[in-house]
Design a protein with these regions (language model features):
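Long, non-catalytic protein-protein interaction scaffolds
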Residues: 1-148
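Structured, charged N-terminal subsegments at the starts of enzyme catalytic cores
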Residues: 134, 138-210
Length: 210
């Protein structure tokens, strides 16, 4: 029990330190704290596809996400039960969130008039069905996409499915790097509790990736 109490104390102290680092480097944020940690400086920047310096559309979102996942740092804490930490707020790195080529000026008067919280250009809170992912797993999602890709043959449909496959495989690559790191850390662990925890992290993520 004492071992677990110490692990909890260690995690709490690291969390407080990580939150303080975010405040010092990024300023105060009037929103959720999230589980994010500060990323290394100058490791990754967005890939614009528009003269305004931002990116829009399926292709650009896929290119940016996969580019980020391919270099996203691995994070494993031997005291923690989870692998990985979110470091980048990709959507907030865009200078603009709505493509100016598709004006919605005709809506702005009523948005202001009725004091609407406008979601145009936002990219989250679409209420995805997580049960699908839990039931199928990452490889199951790939098989489902490949199934529909095999029966819908238009160029647009084929491209749409190929982008989804790229995204899933980039996530799998990120998970695999954590698996590899967990095994490396377990091999050099000096106490059985940490070693077993790291091995369990690796094995659980091997199941998740498949």
């Amino acid at each position: 029990m004492k071992n677990y109490e110490q692990k909890i104390a260690n995690l709490r102290m690291r969390k407080l330190a990580q939150t303080q680092e975010k405040i010092e480097k990024e300023g105060l944020l009037d929103e959720d704290d999230y589980g994010r940690v500060v990323p290394p400086e100058n490791l990754w920047n967005i890939i614009p596809n528009h003269p305004d310096g931002s990116f829009y559309g399926f292709d650009a979102w896929t290119d940016n996400f996969c580019s980020l996942m391919n270099i996203h740092p691995v994070y494993i804490d031997a005291d923690d039960a989870f692998a990985g930490r979110w470091m980048y707020f990709m959507s907030k790195m865009r200078p603009n969130k709505w493509n100016p080529d598709y004006s919605y000026d005709f809506l702005k008067e009523n948005i202001k008039k009725y004091d609407l919280i406008c979601g145009i250009g936002d990219d989250a809170h679409f209420a995805p069905d997580y049960e699908i992912g839990v039931k199928l797993g990452w490889n199951g999602l790939i098989k489902k996409i490949e199934h529909y890709q095999s029966i819908h043959h238009s160029e647009e449909q084929q491209h749409f499915y190929s982008l989804h496959l790229r995204v899933i495989r980039s996530v799998q690559g990120w998970i695999q790097r954590h698996i590899d790191q967990a095994y490396r850390m377990a091999a050099s662990a000096t106490d059985d509790c940490s070693k077993n925890n790291l091995l369990e992290i690796a094995k659980v993520n091997e199941r998740i990736i498949n």
